[in-house]
Amino acid sequence: MGAWRNTRFIRSLSSVKRYRARFSYYSLFGGEPRACMAEKRSRSPLPAQRQIHVHNRQQEAQLLQSAKNVIPSLEETFHKGVAGRIGVIGGCQEYTGAPYFAAISALKTGADLSHVFCTSDSASVIKSYSPELIVHPLLDRTFAVNEISEWLSRLHCLVVGPGLGRNPTNLENAKRTIEKARKNKKHLVIDADGIAVVTTYPEIIKNYDSKKSKVILTPNVVEFDRLYTSVMGKAADPHGDSYEQARSLSQELGNVTICRKGQHDIITDGQTVVECSITGSNRRCGGQGDLLSGSMAVFLHWANIEVTQNPALVAAYAASGLTRWCNRLAYSRLKRSMTTSDMIQQIHQAFEELFGKE
């Protein structure tokens, strides 16, 4: 199987009204507005465009408004599946919680249907967590990719990685599923062990984006460093400019969108860099990234319908903000005993407070 190693913020938002939040900047972002913006000239072979490192609270609020605008109203004429059909590729004997968290978060964010494609020995456990998920015990089968491919035409977005594990068969099937998704022009959110797949085979997502399909990578700090080393051929400078490193990596991969998780999530498509500085809490329980990736898949589907420019940036920012707000609400009640299950219970309230919609 090979050696598996551990390995546009909208430049123009003229069509979007300025955000009029019910929250002050203090409550939303946890501090006074910072009015600093640094512009950089592109080193990309693409035509020169403004490079914006966003630390401006008003600019963040404007992006939040654009995220709000992509959320579809619930219409009487809708049928099941219109608001989103999401597939999660992951789940093995050791890790059954992660795919559940991602899939249930997609549903609670607003998707109509959520599928989990997992290994045969994890399917029963994942099914027992919720009757609302559609669980397919396929991932460890010899012809898994062919069977998963039959479902691709019915899905709007795939989340690859939650609970995938490091079994070579699972990793190989995840890799081939990404390749199939690319041929079928499907949106992708790649997280966790899916990042390990991309770290080993970065060519499978290089130049992935088109008008019909987008990909978002959601590495944490360690995963980002491994991916950076693999793609750039050198280690990331721990004292260097994190914004510039994220932008450079995105450019090298063909301007795919990266959401580098951290104290403040850094989001870039290689042309524009934005920061989500909405405050959560200092509690770092496992599984928060699964809530992020599941909700991000839904927003990516919505944004690609409503936004013609930088839909992946809008989706990544919306999901980042939602996850942080869930963390904040759950922590305010439970403090250090808070877990990701508690955060998921806050999705409804966080969604209403952050986006002003039911």
From Swiss-Prot:
Its EC number is 4.2.1.93. Belongs to the NnrD/CARKD family. One of its GO terms (molecular function) is ATP-dependent NAD(P)H-hydrate dehydratase activity. Keywords: ATP-binding, Lyase, NAD, NADP, Nucleotide-binding, Phosphoprotein. Its cofactor is Mg(2+). PROSITE patterns: YJEF_C_3 (PS51383). It is an enzyme of class 4 (lyase). ATP binds at residues 261-265, 280-289. InterPro entries: CARKD, Ribokinase-like. Catalyzes the dehydration of the S-form of NAD(P)HX at the expense of ATP, which is converted to ADP. Together with NAD(P)HX epimerase, which catalyzes the epimerization of the S- and R-forms, the enzyme allows the repair of both epimers of NAD(P)HX, a damaged form of NAD(P)H that is a result of enzymatic or heat-dependent hydration. Gene3D superfamilies: 3.40.1190.20. It comes from the Eukaryota. PANTHER family: ATP-DEPENDENT (S)-NAD(P)H-HYDRATE DEHYDRATASE (PTHR12592:SF0), ATP-DEPENDENT (S)-NAD(P)H-HYDRATE DEHYDRATASE FAMILY MEMBER (PTHR12592). Residues 63-354 form the YjeF C-terminal domain. It comes from Nematostella vectensis (Starlet sea anemone). GO terms for biological process: metabolite repair; nicotinamide nucleotide metabolic process. It catalyses: (6S)-NADHX + ATP = ADP + phosphate + NADH + H(+); (6S)-NADPHX + ATP = ADP + phosphate + NADPH + H(+). This is ATP-dependent (S)-NAD(P)H-hydrate dehydratase. (6S)-NADPHX binds at residues 163, 220-226, 290.
